[in-house]
Curated annotation (Swiss-Prot):
GO terms for molecular function: phosphoglycerate mutase activity. Disulfide bonds: none annotated. It comes from Neisseria meningitidis serogroup C (strain 053442). SUPFAM superfamilies: Phosphoglycerate mutase-like (SSF53254). This is 2,3-bisphosphoglycerate-dependent phosphoglycerate mutase. Its EC number is 5.4.2.11.
Amino acid sequence: MELVFIRHGQSEWNAKNLFTGWRDVKLSEQGLAEAAAAGKKLKENGYEFDIAFTSVLTRAIKTCNIVLEESDQLFVPQIKTWRLNERHYGQLQGLDKKQTAEKYGDEQVRIWRRSYDTLPPLLDKDDEFSAHKDRRYAHLPADVVPDGENLKVTLERVLPFWEDQIAPAILSGKRVLVAAHGNSLRALAKHIEGISDEDIMGLEIPTGQPLVYKLDDNLKVLEKFYL
């Protein structure tokens, strides 16, 4: 059994080195090209999908669409879920990473970005960019919508969807594509690879590159590689 992850192509805020999180930004020109190249590469290598899962953020949805279109599979059903959203960076969202490091220190920013269980400063629910004001999340209980997350909380958000939707799809024989975000994919990788809390800090997932997992019947990883 195989599973393919792809982190969205470079976004406009990736290009500007800004914290993005749940803020909804578009792909950059480079990001559009990365997604198209990924789709072509998947086609060249014979990858076909029966179902695709993505987030409710534009950059991941657009990447998913382009990948499927470029691999002649735009007909493949897509399921969009907030549970695959990027980690919510709280008050850091929209801030320049370099300027934030100059203000708080490199080590503090590194901990905010990479630590497994350290929360960023939380965003006020009344903030104009709060997810509580976004109709994408209007169906969710207020106490479920985050104001800031660490990777631990992100994993707790993503895992129920893995167990309820993604894993059963794989086990039923479906060929699965997950088009999501750096930290939601890191959270899934931590779970399926059994990565420790310490080692997950060093895991980077590049934009727009298909990551293939070969899995056994218990969804244990046999092999992992980038196309």
